[in-house]
Amino acid sequence: MGTNTPLKGIKVLELGGLAPSPFAGLVLADYGADVVRIDRPTTPFGPPRDTLCRHKRSIVIDLKSPSSRDAFLTLVKVADVLIDPYRPGVMSRLGLGPERLTKLNPRLIYAHLHGFRPDGMYGQAAGHDLNYLAVSGILSIVGRKNEKPSPPANILGDFAGGGLVCVTGILFALLHRHSTGRGQVVTTNMVDGSAYLATFPRQQHGHQNMDRPRGENLLDGAAPFYEVYETKDGRFVAVGAQEPQFYAQLLHGLGLGKRKLPEQWDRTHWPAMKSRFEGIFKSKTMNEWRAVFDGTDGCVSPVLQWDEVEKPYKPLVELSESPSLDVSVQEDFPEVKKGEGCSEVLKEWVPEVQAKMRVDEQTKVLTMKGRDVKL
């Protein structure tokens, strides 16, 4: 781990899950936390490929085995954070819920990362990003006029409203513990996390420029100066020239600067102006439009593919005194195998009891010696 990272010395147990919780662990690991993924010996769909495992290690725990549970509890005693991605009550039914674990380790920050609101009508339901956005209200505003809501890829719910919000809660709890010495339970879910991120559009709903059905408002595709346009080569450019000075530069770049045109904010002319812009943008390739607008304030940007964006990738935030670890490593499908790094973790976390533990050569399951009866 880095010698001067902001989370150096913070020990995190990340119960193995899908995208949101591994992402939360990834952010913490990138900033120096010692993140250990707790893997199950088997999964219903075979071993998952966790590509969000940068700077992490793995320990395999069978939570239904008393000896393996004892090993898990030994790690909990020295951990700072535990990330629980399961549905409400799952860990408590195993006797490993926050009630027990925070009593075992009063400094522990037990972070729930649920899908739906735990006390809401869908609290025990299965779901994915699209379901959470649907219930949060966000999906209702994403899409074109007279079309169904459009799935916006699984970024907003899973990673922003889920994983990143969970990290925020963990950091708040770490700050509180710094002044009080006490851990606490952090409860996050992707519905409320996403809804919180949508505070501004929710507050603006029904007000000027945001008072019409989906696809007929300023920021959802109705305005000709806030739209995505196709270019001659089948690529796209994004236009976001709202302010008058930027709009003037947009018109200049399109060759319309000296033409007599309708007033920018006259909605009655927006459809005609959009049609006009569409024809002009199709007259040049994306790169030709880049030559026109790059370096100007016309607010016209190329829609780039993954292999075209600026490299190297940067960390979430850049800190002058306590930088993150390298986030460009393991970019191409990294993998931390089950149990990888287990012996090193035990040596660093619990050296005084390491001799009392053993790892099964085949399953990689960690247990305390002398107990192996299934619950």
Residue ranges with predicted function:
Residues 17, 63, 86-88, 114-115, ...:
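Short glycine-/small-residue-rich Rossmann-like dinucleotide-binding loops
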Residues 52-104:
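A structured beta-alpha segment of the ubiquitous adenosine-cofactor-binding alpha/beta core
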Residues 27, 31, 92-237, 241:
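Active-site-adjacent "lid/gating" segments in soluble enzymes
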Residues 30-60:
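Glycine-rich phosphate-binding loop and adjoining beta1-alpha1-beta2 segment
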Residues 43-45, 116-120, 139-141, 266, ...:
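Short gly/pro/ser/thr-enriched loop/turn and capping motifs at secondary-structure boundaries
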Residues 50-74, 132-140, 317-329:
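Redox-cofactor-proximal catalytic regions of oxidoreductases
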Residues 1-42, 109-111, 196-375:
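Acyl-CoA thioester-binding alpha/beta core of soluble enzymes
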